[in-house]
């Protein structure tokens, strides 16, 4: 198979939530495949170290401040990205947040903060970018979901609702924008260590418990998602849209051990 199907040379990708964690995993993978980037965060100065890293790979990275809870901030980001490169080919819709609490302790403000960021923000970022993609007749939108897009976990009620919503939103936008040459898919990671959950990974007993539940017997590593995000961004996925692609080591199978541990 030709490497051209996975080559992103000459492509421009926006990666939201790129100051840490998954956003940097995705941005790094796209840059290594040849893409130039627009990287965003609510705090502009938090992007500068990652900008330098991408430039050391020989690619360009334009940092832009973005608050996905603000319509004005979203439109400004999309306009700046368009101005910087003259086009937008790829969007990795990654910005998100979480609050871990028992469902009975979730407040109105907790719910709104998570849904406004993860679901409403993702929609309006996609909308602003899609307008520019549609004008050119080409685009790849990759919404970032989670294993919680298909499974429920105690202590994550609003987060799970937001990620389930991302899955449904992806299908709707794919149906809406496919005729314009824009594909919309959802990449759903399983358990990967990030800033949001690093405290949990410091508990060795919990990591052992988690690993035992994953068919591949370990949590995800950063480069486990590299080929997937590049695939969804590249020509290789040109006839795939509206799909959820889980990268989770199999934990979403929900398997219960029916045999004794060996």
Regions found by a protein language model. Give the residues of each.
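Short C-terminal tail/terminal secondary-structure segment
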Residues: 2-5, 151, 230, 241-262
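Conserved glycine-rich cofactor-binding loop
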Residues: 12, 19-21
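Substrate-binding pocket helix/loop in short-chain dehydrogenase/reductase
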Residues: 102-103, 110-115, 206, 210
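Active-site loop immediately N-terminal to the catalytic Tyr-X3-Lys motif
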Residues: 104, 151-157, 179-180, 217, ...
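Active-site helix of classical SDR
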Residues: 126, 162
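Alpha-helical segment proximal to the catalytic Tyr-Lys
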Residues: 131, 175-179, 238
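Residue(s) in the substrate-gating loop at a strand-loop-helix junction
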Residues: 146
